[in-house]
Design a protein with these regions (language model features):
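Short C-terminal domain-edge/linker segments immediately following a structured domain
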Residues: 51, 100, 176-180, 203-207, ...
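A conserved catalytic-core signature of glycosyltransferases
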Residues: 100, 196-200, 236
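Cysteine-centered catalytic environments shared across enzyme families
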Residues: 1-190
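Conserved adenosine/adenylate-binding substructure
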Residues: 116-119, 174-228
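A mobile, often basic/glycine-rich helix-loop segment
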Residues: 226-252
């Protein structure tokens, strides 16, 4: 059911021995599994901020790729893909695209609202999270709880988040991040297993939010949905230059 690899299954296999679990630490707790680092994965993480393919930071421990399942038979592992996202270009007018996005966003939010407990929203005051609050309000959710994180910096988004909270009459909570992170590191590393750029503030914010709600929505991924950041366009343009350089070198040789 994990089409995009949100919560992958981890596994370790050697000879006729197979272990799997929802976290790598569960596998590492077995005495037959060596605790060795995967230097190649660490190199990828340091350069790309993510690890390609199904590797982890632990040697010989992998995870099942998104939209795939693992078949173990006769001491052999076979990974089979059951889901492949194939985006296609559909011609439509601006208004058609606008209405289509609005409809799909509302449907996505409605799906996530299936819960027996109150639901909160990480509210930055930006377009992504503000849209979630607006959709929840349109869907008739009265008890909306919103949460905003700040760093005691001029760039804090408390003011813009408060405007949205007032507009939709949410129960709004704010928190200033303690910039003394060392005391949090042991728990952060234990729970995450893989370093991420916003891991520390995410962990602290989740702790704060968990005192009020157990389910929370966020606007992460909005930029990627609309072709990513400016740097992606630059890299795409440079790709043609790279191809030209390689071809020139080959012709010269």
């Amino acid at each position: 059911r994990d089409h995009f690899g949100v919560k992958p299954i981890f596994y370790f296999s050697k000879d006729d021995f197979l272990l799997f679990g929802s976290e790598a630490k569960a596998i590492l707790s077995h005495p037959s599994v060596p605790r060795k680092r995967n230097n190649h994965a660490i190199h990828l993480l340091s350069n790309l901020r993510y690890v390609q393919s199904n590797q982890t930071l632990f040697k010989d421990i992998n995870h099942v790729p998104p939209g795939s399942y693992l078949l173990y038979e006769n001491e052999r592992i076979v990974i089979k893909r059951y889901f492949q996202f194939n985006p296609s270009i559909q011609k439509m007018s601006y208004n058609e695209a606008k209405e289509g996005i609005l409809e799909k966003l509302k449907k996505a939010v409605k799906t996530q609202l299936i819960s027996d407990v109150p639901i909160g929203v990480y509210l930055s005051g930006g377009m992504d999270s503000s849209s979630l609050v607006a959709m929840m309000s349109d869907l008739g959710i009265d008890d909306i709880r919103t949460f905003t994180l700040g760093f005691n910096e001029p760039t804090d988004e408390f003011e813009s988040a408060q405007i949205i909270a007032d507009q939709f009459d949410t129960e709004h909570y704010t928190m200033n991040l303690d910039l003394n992170p060392m005391k949090y590191f042991p728990n952060v590393i234990w729970h995450s297993e893989v370093p991420k750029i916003n891991l520390l503030q995410g962990y602290i914010m989740s702790n704060f939010v968990s005192k009020h709600v157990k389910v929370v929505l966020g606007g992460m991924g909005g930029d990627e949905l609309f072709a990513g950041y400016d740097i992606h366009g630059i890299l795409y343009a440079l790709q043609s230059l790279s191809d030209w350089v390689h071809k020139s070198i080959e012709n010269f040789i």
